[in-house]
């Protein structure tokens, strides 16, 4: 993937409902692979406290407790993805948050195809540059977006990458 503009990073999360189904998980990974450069990937299980911290901005909302319980109910997968306009592209691929709406207005989206309910809607994605920075730091505290942009982004933008099947991420191709 060769790009003219600087690459943008975003966070993508595959939620526990999709992780529970290997065929759905594989389909989601393939869609991501077809559309993005995968910078980092991590499988994890949250404690309830992790979920409460991540979704703190929704504390007090009617869905907060249900969301917290669900996100700590099983494994999930987090990705750092890169491409031009990565945030917008991932959000478009996900489709509307409300699964009922996604099924009728955007059936080709990930939530339209695989979502079950508004909480069990298969995916999460950052909605702005600021939230992407914050969310990437939450899931990948060891990752420095600034350092990556300075040292690695030019190589990725120019297409000097290779996909590692074992780790399921892209790396800089050393020639």
From Swiss-Prot:
Its cofactor is Mg(2+). InterPro entries: NDK-like_dom, NDK-like_dom_sf, NDPk6, Nucleoside_diP_kinase, Nucleoside_diP_kinase_AS. GO terms for biological process: CTP biosynthetic process; GTP biosynthetic process; negative regulation of cell growth; negative regulation of mitotic nuclear division; UTP biosynthetic process. It is an enzyme of class 2 (transferase). The keyword ATP-binding applies. It holds the Pfam family NDK. One of its GO terms (cellular component) is mitochondrion. The active site is at 124 (pros-phosphohistidine intermediate). It catalyses: a 2'-deoxyribonucleoside 5'-diphosphate + ATP = a 2'-deoxyribonucleoside 5'-triphosphate + ADP; a ribonucleoside 5'-diphosphate + ATP = a ribonucleoside 5'-triphosphate + ADP. GO terms for molecular function: ATP binding; metal ion binding; nucleoside diphosphate kinase activity. Keywords: ATP-binding, Kinase, Magnesium, Metal-binding, Nucleotide metabolism, Nucleotide-binding, Transferase. ATP binds at residues 15, 63, 91, 97, 111, 121. Gene3D superfamilies: Nucleoside diphosphate kinase-like domain. Its EC number is 2.7.4.6. It comes from the Eukaryota. Belongs to the NDK family. Major role in the synthesis of nucleoside triphosphates other than ATP. The ATP gamma phosphate is transferred to the NDP beta phosphate via a ping-pong mechanism, using a phosphorylated active-site intermediate. PANTHER family: NUCLEOSIDE DIPHOSPHATE KINASE 6. This is Nucleoside diphosphate kinase 6.
């Amino acid at each position: 993937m060769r790009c003219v503009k600087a690459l943008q990073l975003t966070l993508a999360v595959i939620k526990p409902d999709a992780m529970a189904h290997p065929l759905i998980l594989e389909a989601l990974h393939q869609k991501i692979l077809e559309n993005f450069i995968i910078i980092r990937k991590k499988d994890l299980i949250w404690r309830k406290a992790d979920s409460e911290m991540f979704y703190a901005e929704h504390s007090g909302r009617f869905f907060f407790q249900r969301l917290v319980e669900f996100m700590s109910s099983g494994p999930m997968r987090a990705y750092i993805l890169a491409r031009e306009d990565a945030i917008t592209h991932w959000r478009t691929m996900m489709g509307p948050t409300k699964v009922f709406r996604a099924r009728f207005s955007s059936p080709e989206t990930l939530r339209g195809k695989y979502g079950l309910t508004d909480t069990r809607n298969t995916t999460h994605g950052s909605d702005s540059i600021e939230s992407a920075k914050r969310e990437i730091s939450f899931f990948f505290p060891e990752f420095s977006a600034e350092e990556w942009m300075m040292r690695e982004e030019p190589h990725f933008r120019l297409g000097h990458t290779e996909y590692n099947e074992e780790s399921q991420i892209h790396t800089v191709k050393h020639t």
